[in-house]
Amino acid sequence: MSPKVQALLLLVGLITFLEVHAEEELSETVESERSCAKEYQWCDWNTRPCCDNISCICSWIGTNCECKKGIICTIKDWYKGK
């Protein structure tokens, strides 16, 4: 086998390996993002709670739920520079 063919096969193998590894990392990231909602994202008490002890606030009829920090947490974050 010529060196060019060997180099090509090595390159194709490396690209395939990197692609599979990237897909695994992406699926882990997507799964962790689904587990909880960040501030100002939609939430549901049963299926998608808020991250970082943020409250899930809903409209008066129980729809349009959104993760929101209370005023005290907002002031603390502002004071800490977050």
Swiss-Prot record:
The presence of a 'disulfide through disulfide knot' structurally defines this protein as a knottin. It comes from the Eukaryota. Disulfide bonds join C36-C51, C43-C56, C50-C67, C58-C65. It holds the Pfam family Toxin_9. Belongs to the neurotoxin 02 (plectoxin) family. 04 (U16-lycotoxin) subfamily. This is U16-lycotoxin-Ls1b. One of its GO terms (cellular component) is extracellular region. Expressed by the venom gland. Keywords: Disulfide bond, Knottin, Secreted, Signal, Toxin. It comes from Lycosa singoriensis (Wolf spider). The lineage of its organism: Eukaryota, Metazoa, Ecdysozoa, Arthropoda, Chelicerata. Residues 1-22 form the signal peptide. One of its GO terms (molecular function) is ion channel inhibitor activity. Residues 23-34 form a propeptide. It is found in: Secreted. Its main location: secreted.
